[in-house]
């Protein structure tokens, strides 16, 4: 039986830190679903369709990754995808409290759903989509932090 994992997030936009996490997850699980949340309350810069397309291109080299947009409750989405593992990235101690709350809630809603926390490589440990967008808005060079297709899309959005 295949071990299916979900790596959810808003990915607005997907960064090299996200790519680092999903790449390592592909070595641990048979099938990884990169689940892109609609998250309208976060007022994303990119539409859900744009974020899905950007992530598909950025992960095309990873054969066991499927990119899917979703707007459902995570536990329901995981159940519908027949996934029993939820991948979450932890950049800093500050992330842990929030992620622990989410993990407990998801376990309450779907007891068989395990949360697995991965720390990004040191090179990406301070990167977030929000920070990258903020630096780019002020003409800072964010080339190093984004896949090339995402960098081009971000620069076009900000033009």
From Swiss-Prot:
Coiled coil: none
Pathway: Cofactor biosynthesis; coenzyme A biosynthesis; CoA from (R)-pantothenate: step 4/5
InterPro entries registered for this protein in UniProt: Cyt_trans-like, PPAT, Rossmann-like_a/b/a_fold
Binding site for ATP: 10-11, 18, 89-91, 99, 124-130
Keyword Magnesium (UniProt): yes
Sorted UniProt keywords: ATP-binding, Coenzyme A biosynthesis, Cytoplasm, Magnesium, Nucleotide-binding, Nucleotidyltransferase, Transferase
Cofactor: Mg(2+)
A Gene Ontology BP annotation from the UniProt entry: coenzyme A biosynthetic process
Record field: catalytic activity: (R)-4'-phosphopantetheine + ATP + H(+) = 3'-dephospho-CoA + diphosphate
Binding positions for substrate per the UniProt entry: 10, 42, 74, 88
Gene3D superfamilies given in the database record: HUPs
Residues marked Transition state stabilizer (site): 18
Organism domain of life: Bacteria
GO molecular function: ATP binding; pantetheine-phosphate adenylyltransferase activity
Function: Reversibly transfers an adenylyl group from ATP to 4'-phosphopantetheine, yielding dephospho-CoA (dPCoA) and pyrophosphate.
PANTHER family (UniProt xref): PHOSPHOPANTETHEINE ADENYLYLTRANSFERASE
Family: Belongs to the bacterial CoaD family.
Name of the protein this chain belongs to: Phosphopantetheine adenylyltransferase
Organism: Escherichia fergusonii (strain ATCC 35469 / DSM 13698 / CCUG 18766 / IAM 14443 / JCM 21226 / LMG 7866 / NBRC 102419 / NCTC 12128 / CDC 0568-73)
């Amino acid at each position: 039986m295949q071990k299916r994992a979900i790596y959810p997030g808003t990915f607005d936009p997907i960064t090299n830190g996200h790519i680092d996490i999903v790449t390592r997850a592909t070595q641990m699980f048979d099938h990884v679903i990169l689940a892109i949340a609609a998250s309208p309350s976060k007022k994303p810069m990119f539409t859900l369709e744009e974020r899905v397309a950007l992530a598909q291109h950025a992960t095309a080299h990873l054969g066991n990754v499927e990119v899917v947009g979703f707007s459902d409750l995570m536990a329901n989405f995981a159940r519908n995808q027949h996934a029993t593992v939820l991948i979450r990235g932890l950049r800093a101690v500050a992330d842990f409290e929030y992620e622990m709350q989410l993990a407990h809630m998801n376990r309450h809603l779907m007891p068989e759903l395990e949360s697995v926390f991965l720390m990004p490589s040191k090179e990406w440990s301070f990167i977030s989509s929000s920070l990258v967008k903020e630096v780019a808005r002020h003409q800072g060079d964010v080339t190093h932090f984004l896949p090339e297709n995402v960098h081009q899309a971000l620069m076009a959005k900000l033009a």
